[in-house]
Structure formats: structure tokens, C-alpha cells
A protein has these predicted regions:
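Single-stranded RNA-binding regions, centering on S1/OB-family and related RNA-binding modules
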Residues: 1-292
Length: 292
């Protein structure tokens, strides 16, 4: 077997890029950066197997309708740039729209790829008249943005936001500890609004997919038992704790003279088991380790 040289490998990849341009084939790359052109336009830089692909902002499908002008333009661009900053390292699809053979520079559209996927997965139907993605279906999604209490995913050409309460039945303080941009996750599509191809919206959750969510862990706790756990949130004097054995717990009282804070490790004593809500209720006997 002959070993492929780096130059030959580059030629094969360039051929894939040219095929995307001629035949409209979808390619997938990694969002590497955001730049301003000398004329002040924003372009998104995508890496495709070592080649630099430029995608103009209007081809990123981050907004619908015309770009606002005048006083509204600056806040709009600030919002776009902050969205793009959270999307760094995300996996995105694109179709090549133009290329320069000598300079090997490429311009592409994410919008074209997303519309193609929407048509295939949401609008085209099989013999029974059912599209590939329907309500209740579990599908793989790409994580394209993560904040403390929210996840942004792309499901075959449609973006959607999943809030913390829909991520898991277990309580956690920060989604960034569990998810990162570029991950692939299984989601359940809950609702689909198939207005027209440019305005398809969905809601989805991860909570109903993870089977651990359905079984209550309460039998791992006994009354008057003491357990170690970590504080996930503190709201209105109520402390929310994820015990190390997997049980969700709530404390209204803390015997430690210090105030518990997020991510503190605490010792928790169970005073009541709330079967209906699937949580343990009790008191924090002491703070084992503060997260300062």
C-alpha cells in the first residue's frame, strides 16, 4: 500500500470542497473564529479538515428578517457577536457557495445546509406520510452553546434552547460542568411548529431520555440518616442539594454558622422523605468544604 502524501490528502479535501460547490453537498466543519472584514462585515471562520471556510453572518441563520439599522444596529451586532462567541468549537454544516482555485479561499452558507436538512427531516414524508422527525422522537442533537442554566442545541437544521429543568431530573448547579460545545446529545423532540421552511421551531428535552430520571432514588435515604452532598442552588433562603447518592434534597435550616453557597460540600440530615416530589427534606448539619 502506498502512503498518501500530505499534498495528495489536501487535494482530496479540496475535491470534496469543489463537489460541495458543484453538487450542493453538505459538509461539516468546526466554528473556529469570528472576524471583521476591512469593510466592517462580520464573517465566521470554519475549519474544514485544515481549510479555512468563510461564512458571512447573514448566511449563519442566527436571525430572521432584515438586519436592523440606525440605533438598533449596534445592540443587534453585539447580540450576534455574543451568540457567535458561545458557538466557538461548535460543529456546523455548510454548503460551499463560491471558491477561488488559486488562492484556495472558500465562501459558504450554513443557512443553505440548514434549510436542506429541514426539508429532508421535517417536511419530506415517507410512504405513510410521516416525516423523519416527529413529536416524541428521540434524535441526536449537537450542542452549539452552553450557559449556566441553559443549553443551545441544533437538531437537524433547527436550533432550540433547553433550560436546566428539562436537562435532567437530578439537580445540578451549572450545565457547563456536564455539557460543552461540540458535544452530541440525545434529545426528545416535544413539539414541532412547521410553519414554513424558514420558520420551523421545536421544543425538546433531555430529561425524559435519560432513564435514570424516571426511577426515584429516595430508597437510598433513611429518616434521620446523614449524607454528604453538594449545594446546587440557594434561593430565598432555601438550599437545594444534590446528595452524593443521587438524591435531590432541600434544606430550610443550616446549623453551621456560615451561610451555605453554591458548590459547597455539606453534611445533610434527613427529617422527611417527600415521596410525591421525590426529594429528601432536612437540615444542613455542617458545611464540609466551602467553594470560595
Amino acid at each position: 500500500d502506498r502512503i498518501e502524501t500530505e499534498e495528495e490528502r489536501r487535494e482530496v479535501i479540496w475535491h470534496e470542497i469543489k463537489t460541495s460547490h458543484i453538487a450542493g453537498r453538505i459538509l461539516t466543519g468546526t466554528l473556529d473564529g469570528v472576524e471583521q472584514t476591512p469593510s466592517g462585515r462580520t464573517i465566521v471562520v470554519v475549519d474544514y479538515k485544515g481549510y479555512r471556510i468563510a461564512i458571512p453572518l447573514k448566511e449563519m441563520m442566527l436571525y430572521s428578517g432584515p438586519v436592523p439599522y440606525g440605533a438598533k444596529y449596534k445592540p443587534f451586532m453585539e447580540r450576534m457577536n455574543s451568540i457567535l462567541a458561545t458557538m466557538l468549537t461548535a460543529e456546523i454544516d455548510f454548503i460551499v457557495r463560491g471558491l477561488d482555485n488559486t488562492a484556495r479561499s472558500v465562501v459558504a452558507s450554513r443557512k443553505a445546509a440548514m434549510l436542506r436538512k429541514r426539508q429532508t427531516f421535517y417536511l419530506d414524508a415517507n410512504e405513510e406520510g410521516i416525516p423523519m422527525i416527529y413529536e416524541g422522537r428521540v434524535v441526536q442533537a449537537r450542542v452549539i452553546g452552553v450557559a449556566e442554566k441553559v443549553l443551545r442545541v441544533e437538531v437537524f437544521g433547527v436550533e432550540c434552547t433547553i433550560f436546566a429543568r428539562d436537562l435532567s431530573a437530578a439537580w445540578f448547579g451549572d450545565a457547563r460542568e456536564y455539557y460543552s460545545v461540540g458535544d452530541r446529545v440525545l434529545v426528545r423532540v416535544l413539539t414541532i411548529d412547521r410553519g414554513d421552511i424558514n420558520h420551523i421551531s421545536i421544543t425538546a428535552d433531555i430529561r425524559s431520555v435519560s432513564s435514570a430520571a424516571n426511577q426515584s432514588n429516595l430508597d437510598k435515604c433513611v429518616l434521620q440518616g446523614k449524607y454528604a452532598g453538594r449545594v446546587t442552588d440557594v434561593r430565598h433562603g432555601v438550599v437545594f442539594i444534590r446528595l452524593n447518592n443521587g438524591v435531590n434534597a432541600v434544606a430550610h435550616t443550616c446549623y453551621d454558622r456560615r451561610m451555605p453557597g453554591k458548590k459547597d460540600d455539606v453534611s445533610f440530615a434527613v427529617t422527611r422523605l417527600d415521596e410525591e416530589r421525590g426529594i429528601a427534606v432536612g437540615i444542613i448539619t455542617r458545611i464540609i468544604k466551602q467553594n470560595l
